[in-house]
């Protein structure tokens, strides 16, 4: 059953952690921005290695879309804007959308600075529908934009926007000041699209930055369900031993102390025995001379 999606803790059907694991390692990019009237679309360079693994599938970045106001509802209402990053699977299939709300606030972060530069660049060089501009942004990377915080997930089967959606909550929103929010509203208009999807799940772990961690699979289940389906594969990582790790291991230190104590005891035994024999021999010589 599909419903209108409202990103809120009260609407969570269950927890989805390992199957919904989102691992990323984005590289930097040069981007071109296009003003499409209802959305600002940005290109993104892809590295030689797919930057994202989601549910054991590798993805590359297709494009970034910035909407104002947001497409999703957050706790019953829309936010000032929303950044949606579209990914396409290397092996083919439905896209993966990673969505980050944008709110008006004076709080500042690297993501705030980068997004502000995008909006200012489009406002200055591509203010009208159909305009494009090259964004010469230093250090522009999704690695600094996507939050490393818990997120929600759901599947959307609506024609044209079908795929898996990962949506960060309002507490993880990118903060933009009032002037920049006003500027954004002057160069694009609202995109009247309701986000429809299946049950809303929650991943409390958040993403990480290791695209090679594919050791475990678990299906999404409602909270409290005992019929979870788990397939586990052995991780390929092997332990690495070095002198530092050995010296910091209490077991190894205990064994080392025993060995050193034994060596010291044997050494002392031979030294004392040698001294005893030496003085015994000296005593015999003295007695014989007498």
Model-derived regions: residue spans:
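Alpha-carbonic anhydrase
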Residues: 1-290
């Amino acid at each position: 059953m599909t419903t209108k999606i409202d990103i809120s803790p009260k609407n969570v059907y269950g927890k989805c952690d390992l199957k919904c694991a989102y691992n990323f390692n984005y590289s930097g990019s040069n981007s071109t921005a296009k003003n499409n009237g209802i959305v600002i679309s940005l290109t993104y360079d892809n590295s030689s290695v797919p930057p994202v693994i989601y549910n054991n599938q590798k993805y590359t970045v297709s494009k970034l879309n910035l909407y104002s106001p947001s497409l999703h509802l957050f706790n019953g209402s829309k936010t000032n804007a929303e950044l949606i990053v579209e990914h396409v699977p290397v092996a083919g299939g439905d896209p993966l959308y990673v969505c980050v709300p944008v709110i008006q606030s004076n709080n500042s972060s690297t993501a705030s600075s980068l997004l502000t530069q995008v909006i200012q660049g489009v406002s200055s060089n591509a203010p009208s529908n159909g305009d494009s501009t090259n964004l010469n942004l230093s250090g522009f990377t999704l690695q600094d934009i996507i939050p490393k915080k818990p997120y929600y997930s759901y599947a959307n089967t609506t024609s044209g926007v079908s795929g898996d959606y990962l949506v960060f909550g309002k507490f993880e929103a990118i903060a933009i000041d009032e002037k920049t929010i006003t500027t954004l509203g002057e160069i694009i208009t609202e995109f009247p699209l309701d986000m429809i999807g299946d049950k809303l799940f929650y991943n409390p772990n958040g993403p990480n930055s290791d695209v090679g961690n594919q050791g475990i699979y678990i299906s999404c289940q409602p909270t409290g369900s005992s019929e979870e389906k788990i397939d586990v594969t052995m991780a390929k990582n092997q332990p690495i031993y070095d002198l530092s790790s050995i010296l910091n291991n209490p077991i190894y230190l205990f064994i080392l102390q025993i060995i050193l104590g034994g060596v010291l005891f044997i050494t002392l035994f031979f030294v004392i025995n040698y001294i005893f024999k030496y003085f015994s021999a000296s005593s015999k010589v003295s007695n014989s001379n007498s």
